[in-house]
Amino acid sequence: MNESPDPTDLAGVIIELGPNDSPQTSEFKGATEEAPAKESPHTSEFKGAARVSPISESVLARLSKFEVEDAENVASYDSKIKKIVHSIVSSFAFGLFGVFLVLLDVTLILADLIFTDSKLYIPLEYRSISLAIALFFLMDVLLRVFVERRQQYFSDLFNILDTAIIVILLLVDVVYIFFDIKLLRNIPRWTHLLRLLRLIILLRIFHLFHQKRQLEKLIRRRVSENKRRYTRDGFDLDLTYVTERIIAMSFPSSGRQSFYRNPIKEVVRFLDKKHRNHYRVYNLCSERAYDPKHFHNRVVRIMIDDHNVPTLHQMVVFTKEVNEWMAQDLENIVAIHCKGGTDRTGTMVCAFLIASEICSTAKESLYYFGERRTDKTHSEKFQGVKTPSQKRYVAYFAQVKHLYNWNLPPRRILFIKHFIIYSIPRYVRDLKIQIEMEKKVVFSTISLGKCSVLDNITTDKILIDVFDGLPLYDDVKVQFFYSNLPTYYDNCSFYFWLHTSFIENNRLYLPKNELDNLHKQKARRIYPSDFAVEILFGEKMTSSDVVAGSD
């Protein structure tokens, strides 16, 4: 079994906690590696706390089972020659060239019809070009049959029709080249045949439509990169069976977006054919939707912003709801999607893998999802959960399942006393921090009188004292803005999510690779390797503040 393509992405969640361990310990693994001791005085408390556990045999066995099935699906590419041919016929350039040839062929035929009516004839060279184009597409069909196998290729009705049209048009071109059409027109019984030939020529328009369809498939494959696709039984969808009953896929689209994403009609056809009356679709996008009637009103929408996390409450409700749906019938399945079908989808799928005890730890679930979603036959690029906060929330949910019996933890109300930013670049100016809770901005450093900033030049460290004892609880988002640094997702320099119930010792330390946006390759050149953010909290201890977690 190959390792996950991007193991560093799992750094924040590979700690397996025992019943007596703190649920927050996993968040500090990176601190022991990244932060200098003199800059993070509490780091030493967490050294040695991390215990890396191997992936369980049951998870590896489940992955191996899927690998055998996937190997059967790609058995047609088992030789070097077939791999080379497949890479050629499935390339974007090859598909674009095919569309160009069809347009050229249609142009020649229209010219032929116009000049024929004028008692003139297209030169033999032009007709030879048309014949060469027909031979090219015949070769294209033969190569695709060679790669995909005859039974699979001709399981698609459009492929059957296109092949028939190519053969007919090839015969028409042969007739035009090797017979004297002018002589045949003087024979009355051939008149109707010639008219029929002209009509058959117009079938090239259908061939153009089919080539456009092939080009759309190539564009969708390019957009989905090396995400594992479903390419059986005439389907070609950005869709992966994570387990036999859990499907992860990209957004079912219509209109122009269906040109490069899963067409919603094809997704409906797939689910109705494979799991009729036994599927439920979960749309995790807050930014886009579709008419649930497409899926017979079996759609549940969970509002999660792109590149952000679900609330812990949403994760608990989702996993319990899916578990109940699965228990109703052994044939019931769920199809889960966001926009691309990796980060938000992966976060929720990983939560259910833990809830259903397919995986026992956050590390296992993240590894498992990444292995299933990534098609390594095309590229080693990791297609699992990559955003640090999303991985952090999978780790939170693992504690919810194991330490809190699948219920929300008791609510902790905290307030921020200090922000400490380590190894800040010297050219950085105009720092702004913004805190959101329950979709509302509850704090901003731009407000006068709420904080003071101390810039320590000798240690490249910024200390921000917060005067406003604003109570924070449950899911909290912290954003950082620099006026002279690039902005990425969420229109900020970087950000992260935390849940107050999992903060230990009133301290949270996050190195660069656990800050959202800064985990991206393009941000690594700007921020030093030991860049980090630390937050020191105080706690509200009054009886009115200590309340149970929301349900």
From Swiss-Prot:
Example of a GO biological process term? protein dephosphorylation
The region called Disordered is annotated at: 1-47
> What GO annotations for molecular function exist for this entry?
monoatomic ion channel activity; phosphatidylinositol-3,4,5-trisphosphate 3-phosphatase activity; protein tyrosine phosphatase activity
- Enumerate the active-site residues: 338
Gene Ontology CC annotation, any one: cytosol
Q: Which reaction does it catalyse?
A: O-phospho-L-tyrosyl-[protein] + H2O = L-tyrosyl-[protein] + phosphate
Q: Which UniProt keywords are present, listed alphabetically?
A: Hydrolase, Membrane, Protein phosphatase, Transmembrane, Transmembrane helix
Q: Where in the cell is it found?
A: Membrane
Q: Which Gene3D superfamilies match?
A: 2.60.40.1110, Protein tyrosine phosphatase superfamily (3.90.190.10), Voltage-gated potassium channels. Chain C (1.20.120.350)
Q: Name the organs or tissues of expression.
A: Exclusively expressed in testis.
What residue spans carry the Basic and acidic residues bias annotation?
30-45
Indicate the segments forming the Phosphatase tensin-type domain, all copies: 228-404
Q: Where are the transmembrane segments?
A: 91-111, 128-148, 164-184
Every C2 tensin-type domain range: 411-540
For membrane topology, the record states: Multi-pass membrane protein
Query: Which SMART domains would you find in this protein's record?
Result: PTEN_C2
Spell out the InterPro entries in the cross-references.
C2_domain_sf, Dual-spec_lipid-protein_phosph, Ion_trans_dom, Prot-tyrosine_phosphatase-like, PTP_VSP_TPTE, Tensin_C2-dom, Tensin_phosphatase, Tyr_Pase_AS
Function (record text): Could be involved in signal transduction.
Task: Tell me what this protein is called.
Answer: Putative tyrosine-protein phosphatase TPTE
Naturally occurring in which organism (per UniProt): Homo sapiens
Q: Which gene encodes it?
A: TPTE
